[in-house]
Every structure is written in structure tokens, then in C-alpha cells.
Curated annotation (Swiss-Prot):
Subunit-structure text: Part of a calphoglin complex consisting of CALCOCO1, PPA1 and PGM. Interacts with the bHLH-PAS domains of GRIP1, AHR and ARNT. Interacts with CTNNB1 via both its N- and C-terminal regions. Interacts with EP300. Interacts with CCAR1 (via N-terminus) and GATA1.
Effect ascribed to mutating residue 17 to A: Loss of interaction with p300 KIX domain; eliminated the autonomous transactivation function
Protein name as it appears in the record: Calcium-binding and coiled-coil domain-containing protein 1
Originating species: Mus musculus
Compartment list: Cytoplasm; Nucleus
């Protein structure tokens, strides 16, 4: 640590010290609580020291401890921490003012506490005056501060336990709500998954429906194409059929023509054959005629010889030759007539050949037309089969599509209904989730508020606990001091009791002597009137302090070996304030009234001392003398006997003059003294054991 002048840390944004007491008890641990502002990075090199108020340098510390490094916080809230100063390093008690100071590793003071002192506790500082809640009485209760603090600590602990139970209940509720939210989220995820699956199925069915629609459109288009092709083929077939019919008609006509030509050819051939046969016959006849002519020529030559002989025969032959010539002319004419017939036959043959060729061509064309027709018929049949197959498939697809469409409609309706149900369910779940999130947010807010309040209560409880520990330590120290003082007072009381017994014996002796003198001078007093009681009362009023004992204060309590002062000299004037417990009273009415008034005065002084506090009462013990002893021992019954002369001197009970509590007449003296001591002294037992 480097030496530097102290700079006053600002109260805003610096380290704040919590619940710093004005005084601390030495020889006990001192716990220092502080909070670090948000954003402060604590270090192990930071330290907290106890400085004098006037200290101007960080090296002028009395003692210091290293600061504790708390766990890192991420919520931006201040960090609470605490350190302890050991009792052996604390300053000595005195009037010097000290303060806590937080010094960082750079040697800069980041915060300082209000000033405080180290001093021993005083007994009267640990008493607390409480007023009763009900207004029925004006009694002030003087109780130990430790009892009040213990009650407050018990209440704080009970409140902390209630808050912890409430926190546990809220955490259980939050856990249940979280589990319910998780279940709802799981159900929502399942519903969303089912919805996504149904959506996928719906999309798949939509795609299938689209594909089926496209396939149906394609098949419809193909069917239209096929129907158009079929119609076209039917038109072609009809055209071909018409052409074939025309060709067949033409072929039949050609066949008829060919048949007619064939018949005509055959007729012509028969005629030609007949003509040829006739020609051959004519040629044969001509040849025969030629041969005959040759023969005739020969014969003519022979006949020339015989011409004459056969003139007539020649003439005949000439006639026959002429006739033959005419026949030959006719035959030649017929042959000439047969030439156009040959030409016509040749033309008919050529026409028949061309007709045959045309018939062959027509046969070939008819065969090709028949083949085309067969092919067309086969293609038509195949097309019809394909169309029938396509129609069957289309019908099947239409039926399947209708079934799929019905099923799809049903599934779509079911899906729409389920989607509506899922939507309603999702809306309900969303509303439930929103409500649960709102409830969880409220619960979180309330839990955060409870946590904050619990942390605050915890901090305050820790501070109160530390304060209670400190006060408990102070109370224990004070109780030890009070116990010592009580022991000293008990010793002094025993000494006072011994001294009072001696004084009582002396007073009895003096009273006996005085009563003897009073009995001797009774006649003189009767003649002199009431002057003697008046003078006696005046003497009592003039010197009441002669009956007082020397004062024993708390300042002399340390000298436990000192003995009480000895009895006064017999020659000193002694005034009896309360002679009733010493011997029977035989004095007159004036003395009784004087003794009663003085007893009432002493009783009022005693009650005032009791109400003002135990210390004053203890200080008045020596001054009250035998009267206080008689009251404390519960043997004073003179007031009762004087108040009611007709009642017996010994009542059936013993009464405490402070709290008016009655005890049996056979009660022990020590018990009554202990009861009286309870009004002025604390118990030596610890009020509670703090763990």
C-alpha cells in the first residue's frame, strides 16, 4: 500500500456500510457489513480498516482485514459482504472516535462508515422500558434489552421461517406450473407435429390430386387425340371404302367390259377360226382347184388333145372354174372383209391387254388398297382396342379418382375438422400458455419480489443477527458485570444484614431503656400535657438522618474486603422510625400516628426507588436501614396492626410491598428475599443460548 492522503468517497456510488453501531464492546469480535455498488469489481487486494476519524492517510489505520471476494452477480444488484475484526486487535475503550474505511488495491478510499466508539457497557443502558398495549393500566415494565432483542430475533426468525415456507410453497407452485407448462408445451409440440404431419399428408394428397388431375388431363387430351385420330381414320377408311367401292364398281365395269370384249374376241376368234377354216378350206379347195387346174391343165393339155373330145367338158370346167373364180373372189372379198376385223381384233386384243394390264394395275392397287384397308382396319382395331383400353383405364382412373376424390374429400373434411379442432386446441393452448406465462411471469415477479424481500430480510436478519450477537455479547458482558456487582451487593447485603441485626439489638436496648424512662415519667407527662410527644416528634423531624447508615455506592463495589462501618456511639441520639417489629408498642396515640406517618414516608420512598430503577433502590438500601430490611423480609406487619388495631398482629399471609403478591405465612425467609431481589436484580442465568 502506498501512502497517500485520504479522499472522501462520495456516498453515491461508493461502498455503503450497514448498521454501524455507535458503540462496540471491546474484547469481542466486531462484524462489519457493507454493500458494493453495481459494476464494482472487488479484488483480493482490497481491505477494510479501522481508522481514527481524524486519520488523514491510509497508513494510519489501527487494524485491518482483507475484504472477502463475493461471488459474481449478473443481475446488476448491489453485492453484500461482511468481514470480522478479531477481538485481540481492536482498540481499547475510550472516547476516541473510529470509523470503517474501504480501501481498494490502488490505495483509494471507496467508502467510510459513520463514527463509533469502543467502551464498556453500563448496566442501565441495557434496560428497556415497555408500556403495556392495553390502556387499562399505567404500569411501566423494565425488562432486559436482551429479552426484547431475543423476542425481536424470535419474531424475525419466525417471520423468516414463514417467508422460507412461503418461498418453498411458491417454488413448489412455480415447479408445478413449469411442469404443467412443459406438459402443455409437449402437448403443443405433439399437436404441432400432428398438424405438420396432417399438413404434409394434405400436401401429399394435394400433390397426388394434382398429379391425378394432370394425368387425367393428359389422358383426356390423349383420348381427344385418339378420338380425333379415330375420326380421321374413320374418315380415311370411309374415303378408302368409297374409293374401293368406286374401284370395285369400275373394276366390275371393266370386268364386264373385259368379259364382253372376251366374248366378242372369242366370237371374233370363232369367226376368225371359221374364216380361217373357210380360208383353209378355200385354200384347200383352191389348192385342190389349183391341183385340179394343174390336173385340168394337164388334162387340158391332154384334153386339148381331147379338147375336142371334151369341149363340152371344158366348157363345163370353164363354167366350174368361173364358178370357182367367183367363189375365190368371194373368199378374197371375205378375206378383205376380215382384215378390219383382224385390225379390230388386234385393237380388241390390245384393249384387252391394256384392260388386263389396267385390271392387273387395278388388282394391284386393289390389293394395296385392300392391304391398306386391312392395315387401316387393323390399326383401327388396334386404335379401338387402345381407345377401349384407354377408356377402361380412364374409367378405372375416373373411378379411382372419384374414389380418391371422395376419400380426399372425406379426409379433407376430416383434416379441416381436425385442423379446426387443432386450431381451437392450439388457440386454447396458446391462451392457456399465455395465461400460464402471465401467471408464471407474475409468479416470477412475485417470486423475484419475495426473493428480493427475502434477501433484504436475510440481510436485515443477518445484520440484526450480527447486531443481536454484538448486543448479546454486550449483554453477557453486562450480565457478568452485573453478576459481579450482584455478588458484591449480596456480600454487602449480608454485611448490612449483620450490621442491621447488631443495630436492631442496639435499638431494642435503647428502646427498652427509653420505654423504661417513658414509663417512669408518664405521670409527669400527664401533668405537663402533650408537650413531650410534640417535642419528641419535633426531635424526630429535626434529626431524621441520625438513623441513616453510611452510603454504599457502586463506586465502592470494587473494594470487596472493606467492612461496613461500625455502630454509632451509645451516647449519640437515636430516633426509632419503625419500632413495631422490634417489640410490642406501648406508646400513646401521638407516637403511633408519628410512627405511621414516618413508615408511610419510608414506604413511599421505597416505592419511588423501586419504580425509578434497581440501581437507585440498591443505593438506598443502606439509607433505609432496618425498615427496608423489615419490608424485604416480609416481617413488617406493623402497618396492618396499626391500620386495624382490632385485627391480630400476625395476618394469615405475607405480602410483598412492591408487587402486592401474597405468600403463605409459613413461607421461607430466603424465598421472600429472593422474590424481593427479583425486583432489583437480573438473574445470573443467560436469557437464551444463541447458536
Amino acid at each position: 500500500m502506498e501512502e497517500s492522503s485520504l479522499s472522501r468517497a462520495p456516498s453515491r456510488g461508493g461502498v455503503n456500510f450497514l448498521n454501524v453501531a455507535r458503540t462496540y464492546i471491546p474484547n469481542t469480535k466486531v462484524e462489519c457489513h457493507y454493500t458494493l455498488p453495481p459494476g464494482t469489481m472487488p479484488s483480493a487486494s482490497d481491505w477494510i480498516g479501522i481508522f481514527k476519524v481524524e486519520a488523514a492517510c491510509v497508513r494510519d489505520y489501527h487494524t485491518f482485514v482483507w475484504s472477502s471476494v463475493p461471488e459474481s452477480t449478473t443481475d446488476g444488484s448491489p453485492t453484500h459482504a461482511s468481514v470480522q475484526f478479531q477481538a485481540s486487535y481492536l482498540p481499547k475503550p475510550g472516547a476516541q472516535l473510529y470509523q470503517f474505511r474501504y480501501v481498494n488495491r490502488q490505495g483509494r478510499v471507496c467508502g467510510q462508515s459513520p463514527p463509533f466508539q469502543f467502551r464498556e457497557p453500563r448496566p442501565m443502558d441495557e434496560l428497556v422500558t415497555l408500556e403495556e398495549a392495553d390502556g387499562g393500566s399505567d404500569i411501566l415494565l423494565v425488562v432486559p434489552k436482551a429479552t426484547v432483542l431475543q423476542n425481536q430475533l424470535d419474531e424475525s426468525q419466525q417471520e423468516r421461517n414463514d417467508l422460507m415456507q412461503l418461498k418453498l410453497q411458491l417454488e413448489d407452485q412455480v415447479t408445478e406450473l413449469r411442469s404443467r407448462v412443459q406438459e402443455l408445451e409437449a402437448a403443443l409440440a405433439t399437436a404441432r407435429q400432428e398438424h405438420s404431419e396432417l399438413t404434409e399428408q394434405y400436401k401429399g394428397l394435394s400433390r397426388s390430386h394434382g398429379e391425378l388431375s394432370e394425368e387425367r388431363d393428359i389422358l383426356s387430351q390423349q383420348q381427344g387425340d385418339h378420338v380425333a385420330r379415330i375420326l380421321e381414320l374413320e374418315d380415311d377408311i370411309q374415303t378408302m371404302s368409297d374409293k374401293v367401292l368406286m374401284k370395285e364398281v369400275e373394276l366390275d365395269r371393266v370386268r364386264d367390259t373385259v368379259k364382253a370384249l372376251t366374248r366378242e374376241q372369242e366370237k371374233l376368234l370363232r369367226q376368225l377360226k371359221e374364216f380361217q377354216a373357210d380360208k383353209e378350206q378355200s385354200e384347200a379347195e383352191l389348192q385342190t382347184v389349183r391341183e385340179e387346174n394343174c390336173c385340168l391343165n394337164t388334162e387340158l393339155e391332154e384334153a386339148k388333145s381331147r379338147q375336142e373330145e371334151q369341149g363340152a367338158q371344158v366348157q363345163r370346167l370353164k363354167d366350174k372354174l368361173a364358178h370357182m373364180k367367183d367363189t375365190l373372189g368371194q373368199a378374197q372379198q371375205k378375206v378383205a372383209e376380215l382384215e378390219p376385223l383382224k385390225e379390230q381384233l388386234r385393237g380388241v386384243q390390245e384393249l384387252a391387254a391394256s384392260s388386263q394390264q389396267k385390271a392387273a394395275l387395278l388388282g394391284e392397287e386393289l390389293a394395296s388398297a385392300a392391304g391398306a384397308r386391312d392395315r387401316t382396319i387393323a390399326e383401327l382395331h388396334r386404335s379401338r382396342l387402345e381407345v377401349a383400353e384407354v377408356n377402361g383405364r380412364l374409367a378405372e382412373l375416373s373411378l379411382h379418382m372419384k374414389e380418391e376424390k371422395c376419400q380426399w374429400s372425406k379426409e379433407r373434411t376430416g383434416l379441416l375438422q381436425s385442423m379446426e379442432a387443432e386450431k381451437d386446441k392450439i388457440l386454447k393452448l396458446s391462451a392457456e400458455i399465455l395465461r400460464l406465462e402471465k401467471t408464471v411471469q407474475e409468479e416470477r415477479t412475485q417470486s423475484h419480489v419475495f426473493k428480493t424481500e427475502l434477501a433484504r430480510e436475510k440481510d436485515s436478519s443477518l445484520v440484526q443477527l450480527s447486531e443481536s450477537k454484538r448486543e448479546l455479547t454486550e449483554l453477557r458482558s453486562a450480565l457478568r458485570v452485573l453478576q459481579k456487582e450482584k455478588e458484591q451487593l449480596q456480600t454487602e447485603k449480608q454485611e448490612l444484614l449483620e450490621y442491621m441485626r447488631k443495630l436492631e439489638a442496639r435499638l431494642e436496648k435503647v428502646a427498652d431503656e427509653k420505654w423504661t424512662e417513658d414509663a417512669a415519667t408518664e405521670d409527669e407527662e400527664a401533668t405537663a400535657g402533650l408537650s413531650c410527644p410534640a417535642s419528641l416528634t419535633d426531635s424526630e423531624d429535626e434529626s431524621p438522618e441520625d438513623m441513616r447508615l453510611p452510603s454504599y455506592g457502586l463506586c465502592e463495589s470494587g473494594n470487596t474486603s472493606s467492612s461496613p462501618p461500625g455502630p454509632r456511639e451509645p451516647s449519640s441520639l437515636v430516633v426509632i422510625n419503625q419500632p413495631a417489629p422490634i417489640a410490642p408498642q406501648f406508646s400513646g396515640p401521638g407516637e403511633a400516628s408519628s410512627s405511621d406517618s414516618e413508615a408511610e414516608d419510608e414506604k413511599s420512598v421505597l416505592m419511588a426507588a423501586v419504580q425509578s430503577g434497581g440501581e437507585e433502590a440498591s443505593l438506598l438500601l443502606p439509607e433505609l436501614g432496618s425498615a427496608f430490611y423489615d419490608v424485604a423480609s416480609a416481617f413488617t406487619v406493623s402497618s396492618l396492626s396499626e391500620a386495624s388495631p382490632g385485627v391480630p398482629a400476625n395476618p394469615p399471609w405475607k405480602e410483598c410491598p412492591i408487587c402486592k403478591e401474597r405468600f403463605p405465612a409459613e413461607s421461607d425467609k430466603d424465598a421472600l428475599e429472593g422474590h424481593m431481589d427479583g425486583h432489583f436484580f437480573f438473574s445470573t442465568q443467560d436469557p437464551f443460548t444463541f447458536e
